[in-house]
Amino acid sequence: IGGLVAIFQMTSQLIPSANKLALTNIQIQEARVAFERMYEFASMEPEMNEEVADLENLKFIENVEVDTLSFRFPGRSQLLKNISFNVKKGEMICLLGESGCGKTTQLQILQRFYKPETGLIKVNSSINLEEISTKKWRTKIASVSQQVKIFNGTLLDNICLGNSQEEAEQVVEFCKEYGFDEYFESFPQHYLTLLGEEGVNISGGQQQLVALARALYQKPDLLLLDEATSAMDRNTEQKILKLLMSLKDKLGIILVTHRVQSAKLSDRIYVIENGLITAKGTPQELIKSNLDKFI
């Protein structure tokens, strides 16, 4: 009996210590995540806005070619390995793959948020992307991400990011022309509906519609879509994809998705697995090559 009492006493003393050790481990893991994020941020090079080359002729992006691009975050294993693909005006290409394979990072590199470890990105067949100022480049492209930013303001403000009455009228005409009006007419005050933290709480699909209208209103030469229809219902998604197909003669489109049905509508598919392009071709070519498991 005495031995059992001693064991119970020792156990009662060990349990609080074990709990403290578990809490300490949680704090260490949280600190590690914070350190990795700060290390990644501190390792980023400052953006340069100076134009290195004479780019007076860059009035329109006719094509973009990614050539053997590789990338890794500081202190981590390689995320993208020898990625090569191209897109030109009049095309919608698709980067197809599961979450975590590097699709989103590829678009972030194209937006100049990250610099590739190796490889080149060429614009209009001959211009190195690094020779174009970041500011100028971003006036030529537009993007829609899976996580949409809705600003405090009206629906109009969120689309045009301006306040002039003249531009407001242009936005309304734009939305009618492109078919967004049928989605926005259900908002309580239509285009004057207040959105954001102090406004109407809209669904994820509606947020993506706002973001897509915002991107297309900029009239970009290159449109980057990162799971941009993932929160939409099937009917809305199909209508939006058909809209994009009808607009592609005016611009190039890169669609990032894990949805097979969305990928089938693109002109060309690049399948990414573990940071590598493992298959590429039109949907029809992938089927003929017995690679239909990808589509």
Summary of predicted features, one role per range:
Residues 8, 15, 138:
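Conserved catalytic core of two-component sensor histidine kinases
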Residues 44-47, 189:
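Flexible, glycine-biased helix-capping/connector loops in cytosolic signal-transduction modules
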Residues 13-41:
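Cytosolic ends of transmembrane helices, especially the final helix of ABC transmembrane type-1 domains
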Residues 23, 27-30, 47, 70-75:
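An intracellular "coupling" helix at the cytosolic face of ABC transporter transmembrane type-1 domains
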Residues 1-7:
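Membrane-water interface of transmembrane alpha-helices in multipass transporters/channels
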Residues 47-59:
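Pre-NBD coupling/linker segments of ABC/ABC-like ATPases
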Residues 58-295:
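ABC-type nucleotide-binding domain
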Residues 40, 47, 160:
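Conserved E/DxxT/N motif and adjacent residues on the DHp alpha2 helix
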